[in-house]
Regions:
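Short, flexible helix-loop junctions that flank or precede catalytic/ligand sites
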Residues: 1-326
Length: 326
């Protein structure tokens, strides 16, 4: 089978990821579980020769690993991670949705559109790898593109969803191709007149510091972070800095954070996967706790903040059960 046929078959079976290696049979991931795939994988090294441009080939030969995205004719766009190991070369492929979903399809908490109306501040989308953070960010961009007149600048590694400017002017930059690092791209973005900056990932303290500065200086910053809960995300941001910097960082977060939306995927009754959400909103009480370093109390704030639009994973699960999804 060629890759177009493999992707078509994978879509038919609700597969989220493909794992290809010349040293063993192909595997795919369905509803979070790894299974042996019912096809023979094409030669991985040949695929990379076909898919990578000259600059990517150089990075691949130099570093032995590469993240990129590829569009296959007539099928889905794929996010790819190629890497070498003891047995040879492997490709991990994530099948991206056919189109950018909207917030109503994902069924994010009802207050999310109001949060996106903020003129500035930081909105974090967090969760484990493969839980749909990029899809949620894409839905947020899609919402703004339909409802606001903004300049949106994205910094991604790699570019996953391709946007068409509608009401918004959307410009997408890929790390390694259009700028060297997230920090370098973000530093440049502050001179490029964006209203909204999308950061594919907050990877280090320099990027976090620049994101907070951007959020404080009149930009709405949307970013992802690898944590399993909303409260843990705040702790992770603060802990990225040395002790002497934690207090000013907490002060910045207390004033610039708008919300943390954490998510995870569960298998639903339709043999698919459904997103559950946890939402922390930066109310005055939340900001005071962050400023004072009482981060351990944030989980309680979420549990008691339903009236302000907050949501726990348990409340989200109850909502899904009422819909008949769980």
């Amino acid at each position: 089978m060629n890759m177009e046929e493999i992707v078509t078959l994978s879509v038919k079976h609700n597969v989220s990821d493909l794992h290809l290696c010349n040293a063993w049979p192909a595997r795919w991931r369905k509803q979070g579980r790894m299974e042996t795939a019912p096809f023979t994988a094409p030669d991985v090294d040949r695929l990379l020769l076909d898919w990578l441009n000259d600059a990517q080939q150089y990075q691949w030969r130099t570093h032995g690993q590469l993240d990129f995205a590829v569009s296959l004719s007539g099928t889905r766009r794929l996010r790819a991670s190629a890497f070498t190991h003891q047995q040879g070369t492997s490709l991990a492929l994530r099948l991206l949705p056919e189109r950018c979903p909207d917030l109503a399809e994902i069924q994010t908490p009802p207050i999310v559109p109001a949060l996106l109306a903020s003129e500035n501040g930081l909105i974090l989308v967090t969760g484990a790898t493969g839980c749909g953070k990029s899809t949620t960010l894409a839905a947020m961009v899609g919402y703004l593109n339909q409802h606001a007149d903004k300049h949106i600048l994205t910094l991604e590694d790699p570019i996953e969803y391709r946007y068409t400017s509608k009401r918004c002017l959307i410009q997408q930059r890929e790390i390694g191709q259009h700028c060297a690092t997230f920090a370098a791209g973000l530093r440049a973005a502050l001179r490029e007149d964006p209203d909204v900056i999308l950061l594919g990932e907050l990877r280090d303290s320099e990027t976090i510091r620049l994101a907070l500065t951007a959020a404080e200086t009149g930009h709405l910053v949307l970013a992802t972070l690898h944590t399993r809960g909303a409260a843990q995300a705040v702790e992770r941001l603060v802990d990225s800095f040395p002790t002497q910097e934690k207090e000013p960082v907490r002060s910045q977060l207390a004033s610039s954070l708008r919300a943390v939306l954490s998510q995870k995927l569960e298998v639903d009754r339709q043999d698919g996967r459904v997103a559950l959400f946890e939402l922390l909103i930066n109310t005055p009480a939340t900001g005071n706790l962050i400023r004072e370093g009482k981060l351990h109390q944030l989980a309680h704030v979420i549990q008691t903040g339903q009236q302000q639009g907050m949501m726990t994973f348990a409340q989200s699960a109850q909502w899904r059960q009422a819909q008949g999804r769980l």
